[in-house]
């Protein structure tokens, strides 16, 4: 057998992985264990934020029933997601690969309703609460509180993530800042 180096092969003898000509940029080939495979992105991510402003914070009336928070999210870094404002603030996953995603939401909130109130925040996927991604914070009148939520879900194309809130009594919730991070890895 001849000793041939890849660097000396001419074009007709070069072999590209199956389907490379139609694979999207950044894709990796994942073998399915049956002699075939597919091109997929190894990961997707997004960071959505509400700029810090404690002098004129975002505000929203909330009640004793969960409703979606509706701040205006800007995107910091993004691969595979879209920030939407209708029907309310949400982040939608746009890619065809299934992902296992870790979610992290951090915010500074307060209210001026007088007295202490219990404020609950939860992460939702497609309008349903994510198990374990639900916290409660007792907030005092005009005191800023930092709240963090974490969760993990499987994301499919067009799934969306939202943040919902409710309180022990109706109040106006003010948000000085917020950051939502979604980091997804390919699920074979």
Give the residues covered by each predicted segment.
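Terminal (often C-terminal
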Residues: 41-115, 135, 150, 171-188
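Surface-exposed loop/turn positions
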Residues: 27, 97, 157-159
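Extracellular repetitive beta-rich solenoid segments
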Residues: 2-45, 113-117, 126, 142-148, ...
